[in-house]
Each structure stands twice: as C-alpha cells, then as structure tokens.
C-alpha cells in the first residue's frame, strides 16, 4: 500500500535531573557540594533511507518519544546523554509543524538528517549553585522538558519527468515501454492510483527518472478525485510530459483536455507552469487519430511543439525521449519553496512570543499564568526543596510576574495557577 501523507507525534527526551549531594570523605574537611548535572535528553532525528518508498510504516507507529537523560550523581558525576532516537523516512519527505504549518525539513538525499524535536538540557546539580555566601546550597534543577510537537509528513516522489493527463490516455503504457517499470495497465479509469517510477535510457548514454502519476480530472486542484494527493508529486519534477488521447474513443475532445489539465496545474501551484512541458499526442495508431491531431494543432497554434506517438507500437517514442533528455540538460531544478517562505519559516522557529507570559482569571477568581518561559522554569524547579522554591519566587519576580499580578488586583491569599498546580500569592 502506497502512503504519502501521515500525521505523527514526536517528543525529545527530557533532560536528567541535577542532584543535591555533598562530599563526605575521610580526610576531606569541608568537602562542599558534589551533586552532578543531569544528562541531555535525546533528540528525535529524521534520517533519509534510500530504500524506503512510502510512509506506510508510520500508519502503525505514530508516537515517537526519545529517552530522557541520565540523572546527575554524587561525587560530581554528570548524567549520561541519551542516544538520539533515529526515525527513517523515504527520500522526498517534507516535515511540517501541524500547528503552525512551518516547514521543518525537506529531506531528499540518502542519509540526510534533520532534528525534528530537540531533547532538553540536563538540570544543574547543587555544585553549580555554590557561592561565597552560600557554599553548601540545598538546590538542584530538574531536567528541561524535551521539545514536543505534532508533525505532518508529506512524501513527494523524486522524479525528473512527470507524466500527466486524464485517466486512460496511455501514461502507464508509455512508461512500461520506455523503462523496466511494470505499472498496472487496464481498460478502465484510475487503474493507476499510486505513482510509478521508471529509469529511462535514451540510447546515447543519457538517462532520467520518469514518474507515471495517477490521472487528473477537472477540479483536481481543489481536491476532487484525490487531486491534492496526485498533484503534490508533480512539484519535484523538472519537465512535464502532457499525454493526450488522440483516438477520441473516450468521447473527449483533445484540446479541451489540454486546456483543462493545464488549468488544474496552474490553480494548484502557479509555479508548475514555469516547467517545460512536452505535449504528446498518443494513440496515433487508432483510425481517427490523424484527423483529431490536425484539429488539435489548428486550435493550439504553432507555439507548442507536439510529438505524435503510439505507446503500443512505439511509433515516435525515440524522438520524444531525446527531446525530454535535451530539456533536462538545460532545465535547472526548481526550488520547492520561495526564499521568502524559507526566511519566514526560520523566524517562526524562534518562537518570539515564548519570552512573554499571559495572565488570565477564572470565574472562581484564580489567576492562571501561562507562557513558554515560566512553564519551563516551573517544570525545572524541584519543589521538594525550600531553596528551590525561594529561587523560583525570585525568578517570577525577575520576569515581572509579581508586578503584573498586583496590577490585575492580586492580594495576599489569592490562588495562582501554573499548569495543573496551585499556590497562594504572597504580597
């Protein structure tokens, strides 16, 4: 089964907790703090595996959670960093943040890697907090939570040339005679429901990869007939071969087919019209094909070169392949996304709002504090130790949260909530 789009959940490993410990060794007076730092949590790393051709495996496993770092130990020993969680994906996979739509990675080459969810740093042990005024601190940090997100994986096949056209115009037959690919061929519409790839040899030491894409119908750009799933695979191609049925046996008019398919390409992605397009008049071995071709040429004009062929008899196929190979030599790869879009995506990754916090009030009068920085600080605080609690209170004041609460009318004894935890506000 060919699967080209899935949604999954990924989470980097939490950092290991720092430790509160002291040196208690014979002949070592005033040993001091000796709590080690926690180890870094593992990253979730996507790696391209050349042998994969589909996202099928992700239908059975949709949650990927990396291991947390090892906790700090006594005698100043730091916790071990966890091994990264490696997730293998096929070449041509695009990873998007489900919430923001941000493009996190475009993975195309073998063994290319991308960190999709970063592990948290390890919490600091009490030896890190020693000062001249507090030489034996009773404080350590919990590990930083690992990054977590829902992501969408989209697979867009890697091919130099894409065959497009209405169903049953002979795309699969053409691919089968010019390559060793063996797509399913039958006398009914939508025989091809997944992309088929074949390596084409032109006979003069040139070769390219051709994709037989499922047939398009009117309205495909808006999703009709699974149009989105089919059209996304055209985006990586450099040359489009537009196959048109000249036999008239299906009752369609060749020129109308030509206009309709090009309109669908334009409506789906304007940049598809920038690609060179080779128009192929197929089924020229049929009785009325020559007459239909002349009528098609009259409507189309002289600006478009047409290659009459018969995929069944191989008439005209050699000239077609040479033309495609020539176009590929002069056509650069088309970037999947504009530079502006990439720049915006990199800015989104900074999460500019994370340094802020928000205070809301529930119907029972409880003040609710939310925001990336305060929630991370809260999770990294060990509330079982008084010194850690006092440090957290200082951090809240440093962020301006105490002042903001007073401005909203908070007084002694009011309930303040962060995540699922509640405590009293003390002015």
Curated annotation (Swiss-Prot):
It is an enzyme of class 3 (hydrolase). GTP binds at residues 165-172, 190-194, 212-215, 282-285, 310-312. InterPro entries: G_OBG, GTP-bd, GTP-bd_Obg/CgtA, GTP-bd_prot_GTP1/OBG_C_sf, GTP1-OBG_CS, GTP1_OBG_dom, GTP1_OBG_dom_sf, OBG_GTPase. It is found in: Cytoplasm. GO terms for cellular component: cytoplasm. Its EC number is 3.6.5.-. Keywords: Cytoplasm, GTP-binding, Hydrolase, Magnesium, Metal-binding, Nucleotide-binding. It holds the Pfam family MMR_HSR1. Mg(2+) binds at residues 172, 192. Residues 1-158 form the Obg domain. GO terms for molecular function: GTP binding; GTPase activity; magnesium ion binding. Residues 159-329 form the OBG-type G domain. Its cofactor is Mg(2+). The keyword Metal-binding applies. Residues 349-427 form the OCT domain. SUPFAM superfamilies: Obg GTP-binding protein C-terminal domain, Obg GTP-binding protein N-terminal domain, P-loop containing nucleoside triphosphate hydrolases. Belongs to the TRAFAC class OBG-HflX-like GTPase superfamily. OBG GTPase family. An essential GTPase which binds GTP, GDP and possibly (p)ppGpp with moderate affinity, with high nucleotide exchange rates and a fairly low GTP hydrolysis rate. Plays a role in control of the cell cycle, stress response, ribosome biogenesis and in those bacteria that undergo differentiation, in morphogenesis control. HAMAP family: GTPase_Obg (MF_01454). This is GTPase Obg. It comes from Bacillus mycoides (strain KBAB4). The lineage of its organism: Bacteria, Bacillati, Bacillota, Bacilli, Bacillales.
